[in-house]
C-alpha cells in the first residue's frame, strides 16, 4: 500500500505538469492568434517565457530563501539532537547532508529548500524542536528529506514559474488587445466565417480563465507532493505512527509569528499562516486530517 501511494502521487504530478504545459501552450497560441494572427509564434513565445521564468526561479539562492524566512544556520554543537536526526535521515535517503537552520518561532513547523540534493537545506522552528519527541521529529525531518530526495522543491518551483508565466502572458495579451487590438476585432466583426468567430471567442475565454486554472493546477501539484513526502517519510523511518503523531501535533499549532509570503508558505510541512475557510482547492496543503487518514490506511 505504501509503495502504491508513492507511485500514484508521482503519476498524478506528471499528469498535472503535462496539463500545465498544455495550458501554457494554449494561452500562448490564443495570444498569438488574437495579437499576431499567428498561433505558432504565440506558442513559441509562451514556452520561452515559461522556461526563462522556471530557470531563474530554480537557481534562486538557498541562503536567500532562508534569509526571507528569518532562519539562521546552526552547527552540530549548537543543535546536536536536530542535527543528528537530519544527518540520519539524509543517510537513509542516500543524499548529501543538507545545511541545517533554525527559525526562532514558537509555532510548530519545518521546511526544506534547494533545487537539488547538492545544495539543499532543512529548517525547523524552535517550537517544533521543543514540543516534538525524537520519533515525531524523525517523521517531520523524514518528510523534509523526502522533499529533497524527490526533487519536490524543483517541481514546485517549476509549477509556480509556469503559473506566473501564464498570468503574465494573459495579462499582457489582454492589455494589448484592449488598447491596440481594434483592427483584429473590426476585421472579425464583419467576417461571416463562423469558425473564425468561434475561435476568437474561445481565445478570449482562454485569456480570461487561464490564470485561475494555472493557479489551481499549481496548488494541486503542491498538495500531491505533500502526500508523497508523508508516504516517503514513512518509507525512510519505517514508522507511520511517528508521522501520524507529528501531524496530530501540527494540527494544533498556531500560525507563525513572522510574515510568510505565498512562495515560502508552500514549502512548509504545515500551512504557516492563519487557516483559511474556503475550499481546499485553493490551499497549498491538503487537510491534515486527510493526510493522517492516508497514513493510517497504509
Curated annotation (Swiss-Prot):
Cofactor info, note text: Binds 1 zinc ion per subunit.
Keyword list, A-Z: Cell membrane, Hydrolase, Membrane, Metal-binding, Metalloprotease, Protease, Transmembrane, Transmembrane helix, Zinc
Alphabetized InterPro entries for the sequence: HtpX_protease (IPR050083), Pept_M48_protease_HtpX (IPR022919), Peptidase_M48 (IPR001915)
Location (main, coarse): membrane
Gene Ontology cellular component list: plasma membrane
GO biological-process terms attached to the record: proteolysis
GO molecular function: metalloendopeptidase activity; zinc ion binding
Intracellular or extracellular location(s): Cell membrane
Residues the record marks as active site: 144
Residues the record lists as binding Zn(2+): 143, 147, 226
Membrane topology: Multi-pass membrane protein
Co-factor(s): Zn(2+)
E.C. number: 3.4.24.-
Uppermost EC category: hydrolase
Segments traversing the membrane: 14-34, 39-59, 158-178, 197-217
UniProt family annotation: Belongs to the peptidase M48B family.
Protein name: Protease HtpX homolog
Species: Streptococcus pyogenes serotype M3 (strain ATCC BAA-595 / MGAS315)
